[in-house]
């Protein structure tokens, strides 16, 4: 009888120990799962955060293109050609943009204020910026007497730059003087005014003379080929029908010669004015 009672006590003790073990194991496992669950971020949050970082990094890359290597004179290292177009916008601007897009080439436009005021042209001005082109100013009137004799160069350029800003949202500082900076900007006083206004000036290294070669695109091509002699060239052209015809062949020529196509970047500005004023 005593032995039977001892067995019962032993069985009860064993069951109690087993029950306690089960409770402890269950509790431990539950806390383990909770801890593990909390340590894993929600999938949507993790992916959203990761995507946001990636997007920000991509946008930063777009906003801050890598700085080009420069020569002592400030020009880029290597063979680089800048195609530039004056006197727009016009009814041909869209067609010029079509050719440039097809050829994967970015360029620099110098636009005239009186043309920028034409609302029919403004969509292509916006398009030019969206497609990676730079738009600088070419005065309001293109009138040499007003610009250089009557002291309206800086006021007209400021007005044109403001128009570009209103249309595109960009804030350009580069201008091209109608007929070039020589002799128009010969006087130091006018150049001081330009510097005070924070304006930069670009002339050109190659004059295609396209404006006077109506119906003769082949001669424009020959002019460009013949006068291309340096590693860094800035080609002056205009929004003319004959230039539009010549453009694909000009692009082909530079590609075959191993040139990269540059678009003006204020961070990489280099002096290019006939007055050789380093401030401009």
Q: What function would you assign to each model-found segment?
A:
Residues 2-7, 32-81, 106:
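N-terminal, intrinsically disordered, polar/charged segments of Gram-positive cell-envelope systems
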Residues 5-23:
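N-terminal Sec-pathway targeting helices
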